[in-house]
């Protein structure tokens, strides 16, 4: 089974917007589960863990997981997220297929 990684904005100015970002990533994850992929959705893995560790800790860990995936799926609005831009750039650099549904 191929593995898809969901990349998109997480952080926001309000908790409501952060929850909305998590929900958007969740919807994309469900879409790819239905397509037959095993899906890693980092938004759900560390949802609302804010303040426990520096944000860089989460991003480094997510990138390690992403490197083992077959596909990176960009959630709409990814361009506004520095973390998502970094994830996309690394995926392209190491040859992981990137899609923008």
What kind of region is each of these model predictions?
Residues 1-101:
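Catalytic phosphate/metal-binding cores of nucleic-acid and nucleotide-processing enzymes, i.e., regions
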């Amino acid at each position: 089974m191929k593995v898809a990684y969901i990349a998109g904005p997480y952080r926001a100015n309000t908790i409501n917007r952060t929850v909305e970002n998590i929900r958007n990533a969740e919807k994309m994850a469900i879409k790819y589960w239905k397509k037959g992929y095993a899906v890693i959705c980092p938004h759900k893995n560390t949802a609302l863990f804010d303040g426990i560790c520096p944000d860089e800790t989460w991003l480094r860990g997510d990138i390690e997981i992403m490197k083992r995936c077959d596909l990176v799926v960009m959630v709409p609005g990814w361009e506004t997220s520095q973390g998502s831009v970094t994830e996309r750039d690394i995926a392209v650099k190491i040859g992981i297929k990137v899609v923008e549904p």
